[in-house]
Amino acid sequence: MNGDLRENCRLLDEKLHRAVNPDMHVRFFRTFLRDAAVYYVDGLISTDFMQHYLLFPLQNAAETASSGEIAGCIRQRVALCEVEAFFDVREIVAQLVSGHAVVLADGMDGALSFDVRGAVRRGISPPLTESVVRGPHQGFNESIRDSITLLRRILPTPELIGEMRQIGDAIPVSLCVMYLQNAVDESSLSRLKARLEKVPSGGT
């Protein structure tokens, strides 16, 4: 990761599969008179904590900082978050999928990772209605967003893709097709998507 913010963002977008993963977010802002960006995974972080203790002090930093000073200035400005510097894109991605927010700034080599974790805390418990079924039992009863978060806690990898879709006409139903990019059988995935497209209105 070099000091080119646009190139670093392009690289992270690619590694996170942001084109299809709906919970991989980036927000652009200015700090120390420089363009900057913060990446995070929705559901794995506390957005209130990030806004108040990370973004607010950085967005209000109106001083100038050179390329060599910007990382140190950001560290000093954000006092209430654990922070660590990373320079390898794989390490940066690992920080993101573990619930950290990652800040990049134009002219700054690498990225700064801030611990702003705050996710759905319960484990995936066995569904009571399936107590006699053999095999692993894992039940989901939350919103789609929370269910995606629970899965990301189990499989902390950007290769876990979540494609949001809407099926049905009269009563549209939102759903998320989740799969491991590096393990899925593409033909089976295509057949699944085709069958979902054919679900009739009211048949969900």
Residue ranges and their predicted role:
Residues M1-T204:
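Membrane-embedded alpha-helical signal segments
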